[in-house]
A protein has these predicted regions:
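Conserved alpha/beta-hydrolase fold motif
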Residues: 71-72, 94
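Catalytic histidine neighborhood in serine/cysteine hydrolases
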Residues: 34-36, 138-153
Length: 175
């Protein structure tokens, strides 16, 4: 029996087998959650920011087909589309790594459902200033963990995986 379903969305110029997404998938499986990792690679070839609306459409389709409690998780652009889609589907939580509050050239700023949300972001993120994420998370009172790392959170993959496992357990306690 699975506790729920996790959809893990990779960042731009990444893929479904990327290090962070793979680490989270392993934690989901070990924790009794089914999971999937949509491949946005072909969509992302559309340009600097890829086709964000096509990413959203694919994630929405996958989320609507999911059974049981749904958690959306993502890194960078994957976090952005996960947050946006969370407002359109029934979702029990969000796990966002390095989420951009805005993406230049995209008309929609970051918005998310009012569900339990955990954000991990790097103090030294070279693409998304930590203060921008603090400013976005503060009025929502989301849990925000700032780590001594850059945008890829490369030095904190295991840390992110542990936080994700703890987050899954906390969601289960509330279901």
């Amino acid at each position: 029996m699975t506790h729920g379903h996790v959809i893990l969305s990779h960042g731009l110029h990444s893929g479904p087998n990327a290090t962070k997404v793979s680490a989270l998938a392993a934690v989901a499986a070990e924790s009794g959650w089914s999971h999937e990792r949509p491949d946005y690679s072909a969509i992302d070839r559309a340009g600097r920011c890829g086709d964000i609306d096509a990413r959203i459409a694919l994630l929405r389709e996958r989320a609507q087909a999911a059974r049981g409690p749904l958690l959306l998780a993502g890194s960078s652009m994957g976090a952005f589309v996960s947050a946006l889609v969370s407002r359109e589907v029934a979702c029990v939580g969000l796990f966002l790594m390095a989420p951009p509050p805005v993406i230049e050239g995209h008309p929609q700023a970051l918005v998310a459902a009012r569900v339990p949300t955990l954000i991990v972001h790097g103090w030294d993120d070279e693409l998304i200033p930590a203060q921008a994420v603090i400013d976005w998370a503060q009025p929502r009172r989301d849990r925000l963990i700032l780590v001594d790392d850059g945008h890829r959170l490369a030095a904190h993959v295991d840390f992110c995986a542990r936080q994700f496992g703890d987050f899954l357990r906390s969601l289960l306690a509330g279901l």
